[in-house]
Amino acid sequence: NLMEAKVAVVGDLELFAEVNAAKEQCPKLEAIVLIDGYEDNKELDYVHSYHELVEKGKELNKEDSTKLDSAIATVTPDSLACLIFTSGTTGKPKGVMISHKNVLWTIESLFGQMIPANKFPRIVSYLPMAHIAARAGDHYQAIYRVGQIFPVPVLEDMRDALPTIKPSVFLAVPRVWERFKGGLQA
């Protein structure tokens, strides 16, 4: 529990089972928000429905939008945008704090010359969201450049997906380029 998170948001029952089993080792964890599968676990007082929380947030914002506006006003370029954990290949995994300024600098320095600001990139996304390359090169890039993201979660499906998607941006780690090369040479 390196993050000491108070809330965990999980997408499905499989991941929920893992997080719920680890809850004892996470003393600061107060709530688990389930995107899918809430009905099966609503008897647990620390489990909440993502969809119900979104609706409650909308209602609260209608009642008093100044709270949200005030919270937004506190965000600065140095504010935390996200935490990304390293893989731990050179030791214990570490949580890396990424600021909004870090995100913008990365997008501009890596892609500023390749993708003009007025272009709307079509981006293939296949890396896990926990991977910094996926966050910066796919998701943040698409948000910043008003682009489109096309997820291809199974790498083996890439060959069939590329002609359909016709990406204008394709970010790849060396292992992926090696697999492409091997496929072309076969």
Segments and roles (model prediction):
Residues N1-E55:
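Structural core segment of the AMP-binding/adenylate-forming
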Residues L104-R122, M129-A186:
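Conserved AMP-binding/adenylation subdomain of ANL enzymes
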Residues N1, D69-I72, R159:
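Short hydrophobic/charged patches on amphipathic alpha-helices used for structural packing
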